[in-house]
Amino acid sequence: MLITIFTPTYNRAELLPRLHKSLQEQTNKNFEWIVVDDGSTDNTKEVIENIILQQENDFPIRYFYKENGGKHTAINRGVREANGDLFFIVDSDDILTFNSVELISIFYNQIRDKKSFCGVSGMRGDFESNKIGTKVTFDILDCTIAESGYKYHIHGDKAEIIRTSIMKEFPFPEYNDENFCPEALVWNRISKRYKIRYFNKIIYLCKYLEGGLSYQQAKLLEKNKKATMLTYKEIVESVEKPILFRIRSAINFWRYTLLYSFFLGKKYRLKWYWIILLPLGLFARCLKG
């Protein structure tokens, strides 16, 4: 099987049929759909059971329920259950273009035997099919996920499809007292060893929330300090990245975690000389709230 299309969901029962419809419309059905329910209290289970029993599906659908732990823990569960060569995270409130799997197959076959690649990535668009993020002119681009931002200045979410074996190699850390982990932590780790092939085709449609998402993300980063510290610490220590990029990450480290890292072990601490940026982190915290 080529792809595991994976959907983590939490109280989004009413949106799952729309996503399912976009999967039914795929021109290439070489995929399975795994839904991991992260502790929903609505009728998600009944909706999925109805889809499995009453709809005509020419692709496998599997549903798993777990206690609420956050999207990253649902991803870890999905990776463990996946049968596809590739792992594609598709959120419950989003859909795929009709030729998404077909395009993934075409571009993945170009790099399938190249072990230096972790996978491929298409573009995201809004529901009017306008591209989200930086407008790019390339047809294909080979670089790491991290390089796409700091080297090629490509910003905005993309639609990454990663080899399942590599997702298993780089699971999200899980903490009992936290329910969020930035995906950047895993992408940065993957970037240290693998490239990805970007192709300039929209394969993923979602609602673009300008402003609101960044505010919510900031609150999550502040609340889930261990995962946040680990993410920014590893970026700061990535010597291959430009120094200004690392400085900005160090400022964000202090902005979201204050002095909390001093109460934990070395795993979460920056080297002593980065404390010079603590005042800028506090200033950013006061400025942005």
Q: Residue ranges of each PLM-predicted region?
A:
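Short beta-strand/loop segment that forms part of the nucleotide-sugar
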Residues: 31-39, 62-66, 92
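Short aromatic/hydrophobic "clamp" motif used to bind/position activated sugar donors
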Residues: 87
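Catalytic core of nucleotide-sugar-dependent glycosyltransferases
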Residues: 202-209, 216-241
